Each structure stands twice: as structure tokens, then as C-alpha cells.
């Protein structure tokens, strides 16, 4: 117990330190924390919070970190005094209890990884952490020294939030100087995963290493590909390829040695999961995996179509559950980078080759367009711009990440492409979704290098290089103007989308890099 004195908890009844999967499973059942499915996968409910609470995320504003953090709606400031008050409250919640302590690594690169200790009173949260992060060897556990500690006091709420000037009784706070995070009021597992991701996005760029919200895989010739894209663009589906080993599906770093996964597991959406379309994910859901917010039938089988608790049903599992993964969780420098956008306006080409400067522009734009599946009366697509394809998790100014990406693209001569997995032949009410077959053909041409042998033409207004012909893709699809029956509607929609890009990019023009990169976007 003595080695845990530094945690600052009083009268701890018992500490369960680095339990095995079987031990965690036994605790989950004994604590009545959830149910087991028909194939012995444990299944939990995360309560009223079935997603992250971005409005309740704060960074302590103090030097020296305050001069690096890009303060605003994403990175909200909180005082050291208020942090201390809420940390004390969280520690009181965890005191006098039996607690679970889980030690893990974030980052598969020995020179870049961070050692993180999680403290919680809920067994399934320790299980989630064990699934999602890199599991140290026995020897590494014996010599484990935490770089960062997360106190997850999910049962603790802040009743004084109004007088404290906060948004709700929930709080997720990061203290960069003291290397501590504290979570209160939300049970959602993703807060722990994305919280440490946010910290990696603070630490690594200051060491001149790039942190990225992307998936990554590696081919038989050790050629690495990165896939960036917001939710719903096909990032997980397209990076899962029987001919290529999965490095990771969500969070990666890029240092002098190459690309490495931050995680040791995957956190996949399960809504409408179909074993025919996504056999790897379906097959990964077995003992040691952890299902969240799904609905069980009477026979304990999972009804993946049931969204009555949330659309955001999830499963976490160790990456070993994916047969075709890269065991080292790392590889060399990328050969190809693919930006995925599901353009519901039907304007972006199925595939375009980007210059280094255009890559900076589209990386900073982080564009996709969503269709309103849940809101009635909305017929217009909704443009979404998320800096670096992961704005909620980026504590530094987005141009910091863009500059690093540009330097690495140049140094390692990486090819960069923009792939539209969205609509063709019109916006989403008129046109149709790009077929997965056509998108796969574009991806395959990028990965096998055949696209580099194509003849390219210029795509007007956006000034993109698009192939005139590509094996496996109907030529008519390659330039969107050819797929629209109403050419006037096409021109009007194209100019409207270009204007959205231009307007969005103005927010980066507070720094000189932003002004420089703005020259490489659309021009009306």
C-alpha cells in the first residue's frame, strides 16, 4: 500500500493493482456492473453519458503551458484553485473504498511513449483502460513510473458548478504542470481514451513529433499508409484490408523512426454491425472485449440494430483480437497519406492528388459534410470543418500540427491524396453515395502506386489534380461535373462549397502560417 501513498487517498479498503482480464471479469460480475452476452463478452451501460462531454473539458491555465495552449471553446481555461477544489472532491469520492489501479503505456515507440496510471472505483473502467492502451510486460510493470495520473471519480459531481462558472456538474480537467487529470460526473469510457490523446497532442509536438487522429496500416512491402477522416467517412472500414496489417485504427504518432500507434486496442462503433460487411470487428467481439450501451435480447445475444440507448454503441477490445494486425504497433515512415471526406454536396472528386501546400490546407480544413439523419426537415447537407481531422483533441494551435505534417511530407517524400467517400451526381437528395467498390478502387490505385502513372487534369476552382482514367472506376465519375445532369446547379453548389472553405479558413489567418496556407485553397 505504501507505494500508493502519493495518490493522496485516505482509508483505502483494498487496491486491485493491474488485474488480469479474468480477475477483472470476476470483479465486474461480483460488483453487478453489467451483463455477459451469449459469447461471454461483458456488456455495460455508461448511464446518461453515452458520448464525450466536450463542454465540460478544461485545462488549468498556468505557466509555462498557458502560452502554448490555443485557448477557446475547445480548450477552456480553469483556475488552479478550482482544479485543486475538484481534485480534492474526487479524491474524497475515491477514499474509503476499494479501488482499481491500472498502469499502461500510451505510444508504441520507446522514445515517445508515456506511462499513465488510472485510478477508478469501477472494475469495467479498469478493463476499458486495459483494452485501449498498451499493456506493459511483467518486467515493465515492476519498474513502472507514471508520467501522468488520471483520477476517474465518475460518481462525483460538482453541485457548485454555477457559482464556479462552469457549464455543468460534470468535469474533465487536465493539469499539464502537475501531470494529473481528474474526471467527475461522467461514466463514459471514451473520456479516458480521448483525454490521454489530448495530452499526447500537447506533449509530442513540443518534442517536434507529430500526433495524429488517423488510422494506419502497412503492406507486404512495408509501405505505410495513413487514413485521416472524421466520423462517418470510412476511416475504419477502408484501413481494414486483408492484404495489409493494421497498425491502429484511431491515434498515432510520427517521430524520427516512423509511425506508431498510441493504443493497444480499438474502440469501434457497433450500431448496425454486420458480420458480412465488417467481419474483423464482429469477430473481435468475444471474451475480454467490452461492449457499451448495446441492447441484449432475451437469449443474451446482442441486437446491434437497436439504438434505443444511443446511436453511439461501442466496443473496446485489445488489438490482438484483429487477426491481421501489426504486432509491434509501429512501422516506418508513410508512403501515402489519404484524407477522407464524405462530401454530401457531391462536389469533391472521388480522388485528387495534393501538393504539399494543398495538403496543409486540406489538413487544416478537416472537411466532411454530414446529412441530417436524425433531424427532421433538414434537406441541406451540413458542412463540418474540424482542424487536423480532430479539433476537439488538439490543445495547440492547429497550424503547429500542419507545419509538422508539412515538414514530414517533404522530408520523406510522401504522396498525399484527397478521397471523397460521399456523394456523386448531385447533393445527397439528388445524387447517390459513391460506391464502396469505386472508393476501394481509388484506395488500391494509391496503395499499389498505379495512380502515379495516370494522366491528370485540373479540377477547376479547387485547383486539384484529378486522374483522367483509373482502373476500376468509371471515367465519368472522376470529374464531378460530368455526373451532374443540371450543370448550372453544379456550378452554383461548387461555388457555394468553395466559399464555405474560404470562410472557414479565415480563422487560421491569425498566424503567418495560416495566411501562407490560405493561398492553396479554392478560388472563386
UniProtKB/Swiss-Prot annotation:
According to the entry, what is the taxonomic lineage of the organism?
Answer: Bacteria, Pseudomonadati, Campylobacterota, Epsilonproteobacteria, Campylobacterales
Return the GO cellular component terms, semicolon-separated: cytosol
The name this protein goes by in its record? Phosphoenolpyruvate carboxykinase (ATP)
Cofactors: Mn(2+)
User: Which InterPro entries does the UniProt record give?
Assistant: PEP_carboxykinase_ATP, PEP_carboxykinase_C, PEP_carboxykinase_N, PEPCK_ATP_CS
Q: Which GO biological process entries does UniProt record here?
A: gluconeogenesis
Q: What superkingdom heads the lineage?
A: Bacteria
Family assignment from sequence similarity: Belongs to the phosphoenolpyruvate carboxykinase (ATP) family.
Location(s) in or outside the cell: Cytoplasm
Note whether Metal-binding occurs among the keywords: yes
Query: Which keywords describe this protein according to UniProt?
Result: ATP-binding, Cytoplasm, Decarboxylase, Gluconeogenesis, Lyase, Manganese, Metal-binding, Nucleotide-binding
Tell me the residue numbers annotated for binding ATP. Answer: 194, 213, 229-237, 278, 314, 439
Report which reactions are catalysed by this protein: oxaloacetate + ATP = phosphoenolpyruvate + ADP + CO2
